[in-house]
Amino acid sequence: MIREARLDEAEALAELQRDASVAAFAHIFPPERYPYPLDEVLARWAEAVENPNLTVLVAEVAGTPGGVAGCRAEWLDGLYVRPEHWGHGLGRKLHDEVLDRLRVKGSPRCHLWVLEDNERARRFYEGLGWRENGDTRVVPFPPNPIDVGYTIELETTLATP
């Protein structure tokens, strides 16, 4: 089931993001060199859940958050799935719900950033129709990897049935 996040879930969402990030980014941010900033991430999720300009969606698995996605006008700000649920369609369901909600709000396209060396995520998004848009940026925290910009045109993307 996909639903909007609740403020009382901020800690669970921060822990979910930590688990997914450590599993996905250990080759970019080795945890022994770059400890995960759990307190900062917790504060950001608490703020995001209460922000009326953001939508935070939770994919519930057995009554607990198995995945989370945050979006705002024309942006998918983050999509995280617990590693034990990778490859089972949970990320796709969250992704599709985010795009459907943006379509309903009239967004003609959606953008996101993906770490250049996150090959799994890049394959995921490219397989769903996202294309590199030519934008790059340096991530503002060490070791300062590169983010690659992606865009998907929503008017040409079928909504979830």
Name these PLM-found stretches.
Residues 42-58, 75:
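A short helix-loop-beta-strand connector motif used in the catalytic cores of GNAT acetyltransferases and
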Residues 1-15:
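A short beta-loop-alpha structural element at the N-terminal edge
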Residues 58, 64-80:
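Conserved beta-strand in the GNAT
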Residues 6, 77, 82-86, 115-116:
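Residue-level recognition of the GNAT/N-acetyltransferase active site
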Residues 93-109:
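Conserved acyl-CoA
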Residues 15-44, 54:
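Conserved GNAT-fold acetyl-CoA-binding loop/helix
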Residues 59, 85, 89-97:
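Conserved acetyl-CoA pyrophosphate-binding loop and the N-cap/start of the following alpha-helix
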Residues 108-122, 126-131, 135-161:
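C-terminal "cap" of GNAT-fold acetyltransferases
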